[in-house]
Amino acid sequence: MKIGVIGYGHRISSVIKEVMKADVDCQIAAIVDIRKDAVKAQLDEQGWHHIHYYDTPEQMFAAEQLNGVMIGTRCNLHTTMGLKVLQHNLPLYIEKPVATNYEDLLRLKQGYEASTSPVVVSFPLRVTSLVELVKEIVQSGKIGTVEHVQAINNVPYGRVYFQSWYRNEEETGGLFLQKATHDFDYIQAVLGQTPVSVCAMTSKQIFKGNKSAGLKCVDCEDNRICLESTVGTVEGLDPTWQYCCYAEDTGNEDSGSALFRYESGMHMSYSQNFFIRKGAAARGARFMGYKGTVDFDFYTGQVKVHMHHTARVETYDLAAGSNHFGGDAKLARNFTEVMKKKASSISTLDDGLMSALMCMKAQESAQTGTFQSLKWE
């Protein structure tokens, strides 16, 4: 099974490893990357001498007979590169978010509808053992129909969104698209309901300031006293997290919340935070019905069912796992099966489009102070 890669970044490289673990028949046949010489040197050291390298997707498609394509470019190129693959009707694995603006989202939707490509979107949380157990409990009717959802994501490594390239909102599309997209997707996977409107709010209270644009920690006069300084740190931070998070060009909100109304009349609340640290980390949700409540947290690896009319609480302890809590391995295996026509996608582009639409409408609501309808317009 020959796979082409467009954009060989850190994230997609880890997914590729999972794909090759899942199926020994899979191999990377070709890579398109603006850093192709550096990527070639890196992979040659690993003994991957068989790979062909190209400057453009068009060159790759003209020269290679591929069984599938994986896209790992920066976020603002996901749509453009995705459309190139869809035109060839090849199986596609695409990173989230599938688009970073509404125009691209519509283009991708139209391209998908005109293509026969099966698509797997990188939404690993929906296929973790935790979420699958919650979905099983909800679908059993044990807690009754879900009539309210409360979800949170308190991110302990939030500095990456203010000190690395993620701080550029033009590339990322903002933090609803970067983080909430995962959460909105797993909530949708559990609920199976249609959201119709949203109101949202964001704040930037911590990571703002008047330090000069482009300032790096190493060049800052406060780098020995600043709590966010990467100079002399003992935490082993990624060396690319080098920019000042208090500079005037630091993008992204540091907290955000959204309320979604569904067709049934129920609503879901979601809140995310990017300046908490250490033990304050939390990521999960509560699904509430009249009979009971089921809640879970990815960091603890626990699922709890609280019955409302009996003195009973059920607790399930599951290993949280690594690589998005084990979800990456499941998606990788699914992609290999999709390429071999043995299975359908368990994380479709329809799912990716809906999650992106929810994020974009939440962002628009926060920017305009208005309710937004979740319609394709």
Predicted regions and their residues:
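N-terminal Rossmann-like dinucleotide-binding module
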Residues: 1-48
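Residues that mark the start of a beta-strand
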Residues: 2-4, 145-148, 267
